[in-house]
Amino acid sequence: MATAFHGMFTGGRYTVPQKMEDFLLDAFTKYCEDNSTEDLLIKDVKPFFKQYLRISDKLLHFLQPHDFILKGTTEVVDFERYLYQGGLFLILNQNLDLIQDNWKLVLNSLGRKPSYKERLTFPDVQKLAASLNQDTPQSTVADMLTLQGDKQYINFFDFALILGRVGELNMKWD
């Protein structure tokens, strides 16, 4: 997963705000107590994020459990990865209304039905830039489409990350 929000990183390393870390630790502890376990397994990541972190189904759709695998295992969640991904999803979840409103505006301007399952392609982004009457360099448009590997589209989750990168999301955790 790409580095989403530079404000949450110091010296190239991710720093989880203390209140958020406390919330994530409490959720993990409660899960372990409720399930008589010391580990969170990959197969339980999505249900855990839904029940214990209260992450919206719209965001859970984009959660990739394999991003959590502890090196040397095939089914145990790496706790540091949990803190990073959990923090990211909590921030996106608390900003979900703003993300949805902006996504809807973008899709409406393209004449498309608003849906979190829609994708924007390179021509879509070019059309948006033209409709905004912007002289957006092609490299900027291409950068928006290369968030992960060779993927040539922007989905709802990528769009949320872009909003975070440009400072449009509330990064405070209460």
Where are these regions (language model features)?
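Strongly charged, low-complexity linkers/loops
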Residues: 105-148
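Amphipathic regulatory helices of Ca2+-sensor modules
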Residues: 39-56, 77-90, 119-135, 155-170
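EF-hand Ca2+-binding helix-loop-helix modules
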Residues: 1-37, 42-46, 59-64, 77-112
